[in-house]
Design a protein with these regions (language model features):
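Extracellular hydrolytic enzyme modules, especially secreted metalloproteases
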Residues: 1-139
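Zymogen propeptides/activation segments of proteases
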Residues: 111-175
């Protein structure tokens, strides 16, 4: 466990010196909040629900960790990488809501050196955007499909959306 100042220097690590804990606390120093999971009732994806803190199992700022068994390598999601200016303008495709359609090829979020689009952003309000990313190198369920989540520009946090709402777990969220 640890504690990191959000948007400021300084962090504490208490007992667990794993790379995942260090990466998570450094994320707070970079200004990031937790990567959460949107739990909506009645088998809906985006209906009224609640944000489950740390609920994104695929993100370092959630409950994701560096795990060689699952292939997770301690990455932040596409919204966080974009917010930190780790992606160039050409690596994120902004799709204006209802004004633009098209077919876009997503490249692996964890391989930015490949060029191409690594995240799709769909602004839906001044307070929230849809984000889509693909992480096949991570393996497991992430190799099977894209992940969709909300990014909140004013709060620097995110909510993973469950595209398999008939279950209560976030681990089957990829398309």
């Amino acid at each position: 466990a640890g504690l990191g100042y959000v948007g400021a220097r300084g962090l504490w690590i208490n007992g667990s010196y794993g790379l995942g804990v260090i990466a998570h606390e450094l994320g707070h120093n970079f200004g990031l909040h937790h990567a959460n999971f949107w739990q909506a009732p009645n088998e809906t994806i985006i209906g009224a629900g609640s944000s489950q803190e740390y609920g994104n199992p695929f993100d370092t700022m959630g409950s994701g960790d560096i795990d060689n068994a699952t292939g997770l390598q301690g990455h932040f999601n596409a919204w966080y990488k974009w917010d930190l200016d780790w992606f160039s303008a050409t690596q994120v495709q902004v799709v204006a809501q209802a004004a633009q359609s098209g077919s876009f090829q997503l490249y692996d979020l964890e391989q930015p050196s490949l060029g191409g689009i690594h995240g799709i952003r769909v602004p839906i309000s001044g307070a929230r955007d849809y984000w889509i990313e693909f992480r096949p190198v991570a393996g497991g369920v992430l190799a099977k499909g894209a992940v969709i989540f909300w990014g909140y520009p004013t709060a620097q946090e995110s909510n993973l959306l469950d595209t398999s709402p008939s279950t209560t777990t976030a681990t089957d969220a990829p398309l």
